[in-house]
Amino acid sequence: VYWINEESEIMRLVIGISGASGVWLGYKLLQILKSYTDIETHLVITEGAIKNFALETTLDIAEVLKLADFSYANNNLGALIASGSFTTDGMVIVPCSMKTLAGIVHGYAENLLLRSADVCLKEHRKVVLVPREMPLGKIHLQNLVKAAELNCVIIPPLLTFYNQDITVEQQINHILGKILMQFGLNYEK
């Protein structure tokens, strides 16, 4: 009964950071979510993402982990978020590697990140994917279509020009705002 969250005023979100380039997006999302007192975050970081944090940032992985309320090893298939009985409001995978995308759409729940997405899908919870690959091949596109057919929300981290945001930070904030909107959250940049 501890797992059920239906009466709670707290939003529970699972955040997955996979091994695609762009792990900074996941870090920034966690920073924003940390500022909300009514959001509980559950974090899974893949081994590839840990490598990318070392390659792409100067952050120590401990700095990333401390932003989440709970963090889990990717091989921990006994974690709370691996069970449909543990109620969440959904999941964001940012960035989402093509390997992770393929695992999700083909039900290959070999690790906690994939299992958590699988649970959210089977329980009809929102799954937001932020795929990071360029150019996209036919297999990538087919997998993205399949993800959309499974009701995943696809938010590619694309450059936008209509809002005159020209710095990288402004572009990142715009993408994060789009992610947060999926959960009814406003982000004041």
Region spans (language model):
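Short, Lys/Arg-enriched N-terminal segments with co-localized hydrophobic residues
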Residues: 1-10
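A cross-family phosphate/adenosyl-ligand binding-site feature
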Residues: 11-128, 134-189
